[in-house]
């Protein structure tokens, strides 16, 4: 599940030299325009038919059998097999390894873990995009349940391991999780299945990047066990991202026009990020502050987002789509193909702002309740 930078939760400007798409097609500021993002019953039925056939052999294969999956307990001290002294020694080893990890890395670790723990929200959302009940036996519903079951291990392992480090105010962390699940989410695509799948492509890819970078940072600061855990989570996310990406590639083949317009809608709409309603009972701008830290230390940056966008444009051969596009579909194609230039400029501006603040000697510090209100530079 994961995170985008706060600044990317707002609509993107039109690409330079290209026309903005009509707001009636892609804006999400009114009930009327949101309703226009629905797939017609005929197209919804066509999509369901595809998922009932193609997905059986091309999507479910990305899931691993439960017996071959790692489980959180594989990487945690086991009280049932250790004496009290041995258990105490094992916990002390965890805390000694974690001692050198700086506070800003802990903020990103917690933010990633909290986002993973809001899994009930994500499963509900993905099940609803095709009007499922949550218990259907069709391939899509089976995929969603299997995907969710694999994802569930991520939050479980990270939560337990971070607790054992002794570096965090776990009650504040737990409150944040409860607040986030209770807040729900609206990704701004009005249950359009194509938009929902594109959204999932970006989120799974972003999560892979983010956990991969926390693994790198944990290793750099000497906690090889935590680095391995983050790396395992990242590997799962990479596999899930590949599944959604392959599905979307097939959908572009089957219905290039609707898929293209869905892609443009997701990119231009004011899409709510999975953890954007994050709250700890104290900081109303917690997600923004968490995102600022993530950007600063390189866990997930505007540059990462730009590279990810270019990856999908290439992966889905967006610029080469010719047949099957309506005039509106072609405008959508022009729009998304021009976005990398916009994103590169955003990345450059973000980097320039950071350098100016550093050079001006105007550091900004934010307290995070997760780490006992310690101040972290952003």
Swiss-Prot record:
- Give its localization: Plastid, Chloroplast stroma
- Please give the GO cellular component terms listed in this UniProt entry: chloroplast stroma
Q: List, alphabetically, the InterPro entries matched.
A: Fatty_acid_desaturase-2, Ferritin-like_SF, RNR-like
Its Gene Ontology molecular function terms?
metal ion binding; stearoyl-[ACP] desaturase activity
Q: Does the keyword Cytoplasm apply?
A: no
- Give the principal location in a single coarse category: plastid
Q: Coiled coil located at which positions?
A: none
Class in the EC hierarchy, top level: oxidoreductase
The UniProt annotation places Fe cation 2 binding at 151, 204, 237, 240
- UniProt keywords, alphabetically: Chloroplast, Fatty acid biosynthesis, Fatty acid metabolism, Iron, Lipid biosynthesis, Lipid metabolism, Metal-binding, Oxidoreductase, Plastid, Transit peptide
Pathway linked to the protein: Lipid metabolism; fatty acid metabolism
Q: Name one GO biological process term.
A: fatty acid biosynthetic process
Please give the Pfam families that the UniProt record associates with this protein.
FA_desaturase_2 (PF03405)
Transit peptide boundaries:
1-23
How is the cofactor bound, in the record's words?
Binds 2 Fe(2+) ions per subunit.
Reactions this protein catalyses: hexadecanoyl-[ACP] + 2 reduced [2Fe-2S]-[ferredoxin] + O2 + 2 H(+) = (4Z)-hexadecenoyl-[ACP] + 2 oxidized [2Fe-2S]-[ferredoxin] + 2 H2O; octadecanoyl-[ACP] + 2 reduced [2Fe-2S]-[ferredoxin] + O2 + 2 H(+) = (9Z)-octadecenoyl-[ACP] + 2 oxidized [2Fe-2S]-[ferredoxin] + 2 H2O
* Cofactor field: Fe(2+)
Q: Which residues of the sequence carry a binding annotation for Fe cation 1?
A: 116, 151, 154, 237
The EC designation for this entry is: 1.14.19.11, 1.14.19.2
**Tissue specificity as recorded in UniProt:** Preferentially expressed in the flower labellum.
What protein family does this chain belong to?
Belongs to the fatty acid desaturase type 2 family.
* Described purpose of this protein according to its UniProt entry: Converts stearoyl-ACP to oleoyl-ACP by introduction of a cis double bond between carbons 9 and 10 of the acyl chain. Converts palmitoyl-ACP to (4Z)-hexadec-4-enoyl-ACP by introduction of a cis double bond between carbons 4 and 5 of the acyl chain.
What does the annotation say about its assembly with partners?
Answer: Homodimer.
Quote the protein name from its UniProt record.
Palmitoyl-[acyl-carrier-protein] 4-desaturase 1, chloroplastic
Give the originating organism.
Answer: Ophrys sphegodes (Early spider orchid)
- Gene that produces this protein: SAD1
């Amino acid at each position: 599940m994961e995170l985008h930078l706060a600044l990317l939760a707002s609509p993107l400007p039109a690409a330079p030299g290209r026309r903005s798409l009509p707001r009636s097609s892609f804006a999400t500021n009114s009930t009327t325009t949101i309703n226009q993002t629905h797939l017609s019953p005929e197209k919804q039925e066509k999509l369901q038919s595809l998922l009932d056939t193609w997905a059986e052999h091309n999507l479910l294969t990305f899931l691993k059998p439960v017996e071959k999956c790692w489980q959180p307990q594989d990487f945690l001290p086991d009280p049932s097999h250790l004496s009290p002294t041995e258990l105490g020694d094992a916990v002390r080893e965890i805390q000694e390894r974690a001692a050198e990890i700086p506070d800003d890395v802990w903020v990103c670790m917690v933010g990633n873990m909290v986002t993973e723990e809001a899994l009930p929200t994500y499963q509900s959302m993905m099940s609803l995009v095709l009007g499922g009940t949550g218990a259907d036996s069709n391939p899509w519903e089976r995929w969603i349940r299997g995907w969710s079951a694999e994802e569930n291990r991520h939050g479980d392992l990270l939560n337990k391991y971070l607790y054992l480090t002794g570096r965090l105010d776990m009650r504040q962390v737990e409150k944040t999780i409860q607040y986030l699940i209770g807040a729900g989410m609206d990704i701004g695509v009005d249950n359009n299945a194509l938009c929902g799948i594109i959204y999932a492509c970006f989120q799974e890819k972003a999560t892979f990047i983010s956990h991969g970078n926390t693994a790198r940072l944990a290793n750099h600061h000497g906690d090889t066990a935590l680095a391995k855990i983050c790396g395992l989570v990242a590997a799962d996310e990479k596999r899930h991202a590949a599944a959604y990406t392959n599905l979307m590639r097939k959908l572009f083949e089957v219905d290039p026009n609707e898929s293209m317009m869905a892609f443009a809608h997701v990119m231009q709409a004011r899409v709510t990020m999975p953890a954007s309603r994050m709250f700890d009972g104290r900081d109303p701008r917690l997600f923004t502050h968490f995102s600022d830290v993530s950007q600063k230390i390189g866990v997930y940056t505007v540059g990462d987002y730009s590279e990810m966008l270019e990856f999908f444009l290439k992966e889905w051969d967006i610029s080469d789509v010719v047949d099957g596009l309506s005039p509106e579909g072609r405008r959508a194609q022009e729009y998304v193909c021009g976005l990398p230039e916009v994103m590169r400029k955003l990345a450059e501006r973000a980097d320039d702002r950071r350098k100016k603040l550093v050079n001006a000697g105007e550091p900004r510090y934010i307290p995070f309740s997760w780490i006992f209100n310690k101040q972290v530079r952003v």
